[in-house]
Swiss-Prot record:
The gene is lepA. It comes from Trichormus variabilis (strain ATCC 29413 / PCC 7937). Gene3D superfamilies: 3.30.70.240, Elongation factor 4, C-terminal domain, Elongation Factor G (Translational Gtpase), domain 3, P-loop containing nucleotide triphosphate hydrolases, Translation factors. It is found in: Cell inner membrane. Its main location: membrane. SUPFAM superfamilies: EF-G C-terminal domain-like, P-loop containing nucleoside triphosphate hydrolases. This is Elongation factor 4.
Length: 603
């Protein structure tokens, strides 16, 4: 690899809402610069997880180095850092933005600006990135570039005089994009002579080489064989492999300020090479770490239990391996009276939870029971202590707590005018507080609500999509905790509380939720040899109950006529057996029952 001066390096990323054609555009850029052989080219080249291809979304961050001969005759190195577009992964976006000097803002010319685009653009502006607007999909019959340019200027306030019209699918406008990257995105500052500081923006676990770290050199130079020090985890390593990603890994001997690459150093766990950490040299440590890193905090929690108790160790190993690749996944062991041993896991949001669950089942062959998601509540005890509780069964007794506070999020929805009414109704049903409503261009509106996170994590997104026929988009971020009259709703099956079905709900909604839970469980739990009562209770007060009738064998089938006392004797014997069975028998609760909590109809 030839050494390219920092002046001819460009580090950029692509910001786009889900489905606006970001991965396809990345493919075209790789092809146009000859980085990937035509023979090896496949769609969504940078999305290398099967799950990403299937869902058509980007989850893990990828990076690619492209060599580009610009029109001015100079050879440039373009480092493309791909970013995910989904709201759950905004922490991954902020990491990749910190490694760039510029961004391509890709907007679908037929759909216009969506909520997520907006959120990511604000992140990019916070990092002072140069933003180049690109209108994608202009080959579609419904494309309205002029309207969308107006939207970008009005909503985001970006000057769109230099906006590029493109179609990644047809390959239109690709050379213009590459030229714009060279001309408009500033080169990284030339700080080769300073002490080494490099930012880790991703890492993944390789079973042969240990953790492979993707990083961007901010200052100084790093060489193969250097002993490096990671400032946040306070660990030392020797670099035994160093290289660049183009997009497959190519070894090099050294990387200078402004370059993006990877290294391997026999690191055992990703927790030791945290994303956002600063790399510096052991013998010439930098004075301070790079700014702008925040720990990704999980917002949604749920219990994961193996259906087969023998798989507990396998689940632990699988979670450890996923954790190697996923800095935001948290877990701790948990025991449940109904389901035995499992883990309490923390996620960034619902999509993150689904993806982790799907990867556990698909890549590690596990059969899991997942409990309903819950959020982190803040409990102020009578002694004035603050407790953070992510599991309803850990809630202190009513006389030990003064108040419960729940997290609120600010939800911004962008929707066509037609659906404003139904989305307002949805938000109000979810205890939302109306904050703002703005009319954008031609029949599009933004709605701003403050809604408890617990109401958003279950199925708010699905409901919003179905009510707006898929046209609305949303984005949310945490705004803090507020006090509400919340109660713990216990579900008892056959007289025993099932801790995995317990939840914390608003007092006004408790009766409705308890009622529908009991009805749903009655449908889903199979009939047993004895009568099974299902009760929903708050404290010791039962607020809803249902019964699953017993299956009974016809013990009188063999009596033809004959004495009534003989029949009575048989019936009494059966009743006695049922009674004994009721006291010792266990009720089998299927996985669907736990999932039912997710799909309670509360829209």
């Amino acid at each position: 690899m030839t050494d390219v001066p920092a002046v001819r390096i460009r580090n950029f990323c692509i910001i786009a809402h889900i489905d606006h054609g970001k991965s396809t555009l990345a493919d075209r850029l790789l092809q146009a610069t000859g980085t990937v052989d035509e023979r090896q080219m496949k769609e969504q080249f940078l999305d290398n997880m099967d799950l990403e291809r299937e869902r058509g979304i980007t989850i893990k961050l990828q990076a690619a180095r492209m060599n580009y001969q610009a029109k001015d005759g100079q050879q440039y190195v373009l480092n493309l850092i791909d970013t995910p577009g989904h709201v759950d992964f905004s922490y991954e976006v902020s990491r990749s933005l910190a490694a760039c000097e510029g961004a391509l803002l890709v907007v679908d010319a037929s759909q216009g600006v969506e909520a997520q685009t907006l959120a990511n653009v604000y992140l990019a502006l916070e990092h002072n990135l140069e933003i180049i607007p690109v209108l994608n999909k202009i080959d579609l019959p419904g494309a309205e570039p002029d309207r969308v340019i107006g939207e970008i200027e009005e909503i985001i306030g970006l000057d769109c005089s230099g906006a590029i019209l493109a179609s990644a699918k047809e390959g239109i406008g690709i050379s213009e994009i590459l030229e714009a990257v060279v001309e408009r995105i500033p080169p990284p500052p030339n700080t080769v002579d300073q002490r080494l500081r490099a930012l880790i923006f991703d890492s993944y676990y390789d079973i042969y080489r240990g953790v492979i770290v993707y990083f961007r050199v901010m200052d100084g130079t790093v060489k193969k064989g250097d002993r490096v020090y990671l400032m946040a985890s306070e660990k030392e390593y020797e670099i035994d492999e160093l290289g660049v990603l183009s997009p497959t890994q190519k070894p090099v001997d050294e990387l200078h300020a402004g370059e993006v690459g990877y290294f391997g150093a026999a690191i055992k766990a990703v927790a030791d090479a945290r994303v956002g950490d600063t790399i510096t040299l052991c013998n010439a440590k930098a004075a301070e770490a790079l700014p702008g890193y925040t720990e990704a905090n999980p917002m949604v929690f749920c219990g994961m239990f193996p259906i087969d108790a023998d798989q507990f160790e396998d689940l632990r190993e699988a979670l450890e391996k996923l954790r190697l690749n996923d800095a935001a996944l948290q877990y701790e062991p948990e025991t449940s009276s109904a389901m035995g041993f499992g883990f309490r896991c923390g996620f960034l949001g619902l999509l993150h939870m689904e993806i982790v669950q799907e990867r556990l089942e698909r890549e590690y062959d596990l059969d899991l029971i997942i409990t309903a998601p819950s959020v982190v509540y803040k409990v102020i005890t009578t002694k004035g202590e603050e407790l953070y509780i992510d599991n309803p069964s850990h809630l202190p007794a009513p006389n030990d707590r003064e108040r419960i506070e729940e997290p609120y999020v600010k939800v911004e929805m962008i929707t066509p005018e037609t659906y404003v009414g139904t989305l307002m109704e949805l938000s109000q049903n979810r205890r939302g507080i109306f904050k703002d409503m703005k009319y954008l261009t031609q029949g599009r509106t933004t709605l701003t609500y403050e809604i408890p996170l617990a109401e958003v994590v279950t199925d708010f997104f699905d409901q919003m999509k179905s009510r707006s026929r898929g046209y609305a988009s949303m984005e949310y971020h945490l705004i803090g905790y507020r006090e509400n009259p919340l109660v713990k709703l216990d579900i008892m099956i056959n007289g025993d509380p099932v801790d995995s079905l317990a939840m914390i709900v608003h007092r006004d909604k408790a009766y409705g939720v308890g009622r529908s839970m009991a009805e749903k469980l009655k449908e889903l739990i199979p009939r047993h040899q004895f009568k099974v009562p299902i009760q929903a209770s708050i404290g010791s007060k039962v607020i809803a109950s249902e019964h699953i009738p017993a299956l009974r064998k016809d013990v009188l089938a063999k009596c033809y006529g004959g004495d009534i006392s003989r029949k009575k004797k048989l019936l009494q014997k059966q009743a006695k057996g049922k009674k004994r069975m009721k006291s010792v028998g266990t009720v089998d609760v299927p996985q669907e029952a736990f999932m039912a909590v997710l799909r309670l109809d509360q829209s």
